[in-house]
Amino acid sequence: MKTLQTSPKKDGYRMPGEFEAHKDVYLLWPERPDNWREGAKPAQATFAKVAETIAQFESVTVGVSDRQYTNARHMLADNIQVVEMSNNDSWIRDCGPTFVVNDKGDSRGVDWTFNAWGGLVDGLYFPWDKDDRVAQKVCEIEGRDRYRLDDLVLEGGSTHVDGEGTLLVTEECLLSDGRNPQLSKEQIESILKEYLNVEKIIWLKKGIYLDETNGHVDNIANFVKPGQVVLAWTDDQSDPQYAISKENYDMLINETDAKGRKLQVEKLYLPKPILITEAESQGVDTVDGTLPRLAGDRLAASYVNYYTANGGIVFPLFNDPMDEKAQEILQKLYPDRKIVGVPAREILLGGGNIHCITQQIPAGR
């Protein structure tokens, strides 16, 4: 593995849409007791189910710490590869590499700086040094060269692309004080265009209400395919989420993509607000410097936080009446893919969902 001093744009590489073909997908194994309740045992069972479900469609590799290797190997199916990989927590979408591809089928990793969603300003835990090495380790395992950005803090969940030159982000996240206060919006845009090789960036204002990542785009909007966007939605005008989604909807329906197409926007309805219970809160260790999980706190539940696999969609279930409607909408949006729901409250309790715990490797070399 080489660390390259050029850029994807200069080298003819682009970030593909998640709906394009994958070689495999990576997850990290949860274990920290100050984020996952009951010593992470319920979360581990859920992660194992997500991995097993995705393995119906593509190869799966799970990175685990030395402490958890034997346990994870026991809990995960035999067709899932388990590798030792130290980490601070299990959000590989955000700390893992963003892969870019060229027209010959070659791929490389982009290794952004990771600081736990805000560093010492409003980050969610400290330290995060092991997480910041995950992207390099994945590139090493995969035999892919990488681009390393020491001067830009970015998480994979804060970007979605259509593979044809258009990028979706939120101002709430990318312009937050804890990430890149030294850079202007225009400077951030210039770096993203260079390292994702996109031509147009659509800046939504905010993400899901109370999303602790400062409003990652992958929880509120996604490209189904070029020219078509799915958006998290509620009809409840008394919910703070309504104004956020409405502003994003009004922006998107009046936008064009990099190819000049008007965007088709599909609404994916949210479940009713989900709150942490007293029992769930008491199961999480209290540690200074880590975001507490308090009873009554509203969680950032969204069906948009799904994973697009080869031939399948793996989406979160919340034991809510909207689960069934989400399945119907996703089936309409992806008629050629199998739609599979996985009960995902345990991931939600940790601060994210299925898309947040996955990182795909594009097909090719």
From Swiss-Prot:
The keyword NADP appears for this protein: no
Alphabetized UniProt keyword annotations: Hydrolase
Catalytic activity, EC: 3.5.3.12
EC supergroup of this enzyme: hydrolase
Pfam families given in the database record: PAD_porph
PANTHER family from the UniProt entry: AGMATINE DEIMINASE-RELATED
NCBIfam families in the cross-refs: agmatine_aguA, PRK13551.1
Entry protein name: Putative agmatine deiminase
Organism annotation: Latilactobacillus sakei subsp. sakei (strain 23K)
